[in-house]
Amino acid sequence: MASPVLLLKEGTSRTTGRDALRNNILAAKTLAEMLRSSLGPKGLDKMLIDSFGDVTITNDGATIVKDMEIQHPAAKLLVEAAKAQDAEVGDGTTSAVVLAGALLEKAESLLDQNIHPTIIIEGYKKAYTKALELLPQLGTRIDIRDLNSSVARDTLRKIAFTTLASKFIAEGAELNKIIDMVIDAIVNVAEPLPNGGYNVSLDLIKIDKKKGGSIEDSVLVKGLVLDKEVVHPGMPRRVTKAKIAVLDAALEVEKPEISAKISITSPEQIKAFLDEESKYLKDMVDKLASIGANVVICQKGIDDIAQHFLAKKGILAVRRVKRSDIEKLEKALGARIISSIKDATPDDLGYAELVEERRVGNDKMVFIEGAKNLKAVNILLRGSNDMALDEAERSINDALHALRNILLEPVILPGGGAIELELAMKLREYARSVGGKEQLAIEAFADALEEIPMILAETAGLEAISALMDLRARHAKGLTNTGVDVIGGKIVDDVYALNIIEPIRVKAQVLKSATEAATAILKIDDLIAAAPLKSEKKGGEGSKEESGGEGGAGTPSLGD
């Protein structure tokens, strides 16, 4: 009798065929189900508590999946899809995960009918390609050549409103203030493109948060704000026509790299040592003054003696500024970062109309306005607590990305589930022209798209199935812009009239991320999970059998 062949390491678990596939589908569906209730303007928040006890309250899909400690490898694929969505377009993460979950749920029904995963994958790919082809035909091209025109600003307001309304950070006057700030920031940094759109570098838009006041107290600064104060009481608090030295070298006496001791045998030697130290620091300050600097912004420390000499020269100085801020200052001020003070030249200096220390709440901050590169802007957010500020920052980031998307490709689509309904209808027509079992997969893709309007109807307080039937009937009559007005809690014939619109780039990326994640999971038919390391076995809760290896072959485990 032949001896058994040991192919895998002891303790390795393996699940094959349909069992592996269904296990992965279940894990992905579970994650999608968790995010389902966070979709749309009336989406509910999730409270996330990390291992240190820090609490995050948000309905932002990207933040939820990043902060959840997902273990199951298939669910991680959906997390990667959400991250790709966030990195590419900065919005639509919840939609991408929910749609991927719906695609896998519909695929499971087809698997029950003994349709091979390869056929489902091919059908999904054809449906995705057709949907991408249909999007521009169903969209409306907008004229944004003059960003300061009332028509262009009105369109940008609608886009920003759709994004911010789902975050619920503010209402009424506060929401209008935030929308105006976001639009002004985007318009300020936009660069025209040959296709009639604009390129927007979001690196030029800095967001700072300061606790205190309300959202309405937030301001847009055409320049930069540093969350630091002037280092010495004898320094000026306001400098106009500032020539700014940006340093990543310390204004301190450097310690030698090797261990060294100084042997002092008399009081005169102590005095000589201290005098030499003062002279060294004075020479550094004199050098900065000689090249014309009247403001010094330093990434590292500034010695007390150096502060004294800077104050005597009437130079405003700020120390221990973050590296990211130093790099932004370099771009905004037209400066060159100075690493060696003795080699500094006047050409290394940046320029700003005004550098001023101002009190914000209980703290002081340094405002740099009228920078050489007028494209740099800073949004300073105010709010009552850290959680509100964090959510406001996430919301504004989403709105900035949404506006960037519309400026890159100025085509808008009807929101409120209208575009998904219309795509589903067109895909069913297309499916009839495709022969074989792939037709069923294309129809399943169309059914999955209808999950989005159904969820929106649910969050609006409507009965989901009835709402879907109503939407289908109206779309069949040619009312292509019929969708769900979630805030009003009703179905409307023209979502454009209520400013419920979405950029085409976001929707195209949602389809791409969801389809890629779903097809990647459908391709897997073998799940081999290595045994956990001994340290994990000791420290982990439960046995390998309970967790299914590395979140793998047993019951789907999304987190700890």
UniProtKB/Swiss-Prot annotation:
Keyword Cytoplasm: yes
Annotated compartments: Cytoplasm
Keywords: ATP-binding, Chaperone, Cytoplasm, Hydrolase, Nucleotide-binding, Stress response
Molecular functions per Gene Ontology: ATP binding; ATP hydrolysis activity; ATP-dependent protein folding chaperone; unfolded protein binding
Highest taxon listed in the record's lineage: Archaea
Pfam family name, one: Cpn60_TCP1
Chain intervals for the UniProt region annotation (Disordered): 535-560
Inducing stimuli: Transcription is induced by heat shock (shift from 75 to 86 degrees Celsius). At 80 degrees Celsius and above ThsA and ThsB are the major proteins synthesized (at protein level).
Catalytic activity from the UniProt record: ATP + H2O = ADP + phosphate + H(+)
EC number, as in UniProt: 3.6.4.-
Class of enzymatic activity (EC top level): hydrolase
GO cellular component, one term: cytoplasm
Gene3D superfamilies reported in the protein's UniProt record: GroEL, GroEL-like equatorial domain, TCP-1-like chaperonin intermediate domain
Biased composition range(s): Basic and acidic residues: 535-547
Subunit structure: Forms a heterooligomeric complex of two stacked nine-membered rings; one of alpha and the other of beta subunits. Sometimes called a 'rosettasome'.
Family: Belongs to the TCP-1 chaperonin family.
Task of the protein: Molecular chaperone; binds unfolded polypeptides in vitro, stimulates protein folding and has ATPase activity. One of the most abundant proteins in the cell at all temperatures.
Protein name per UniProt: Thermosome subunit alpha
Species this chain originates from: Saccharolobus shibatae (strain ATCC 51178 / DSM 5389 / JCM 8931 / NBRC 15437 / B12)
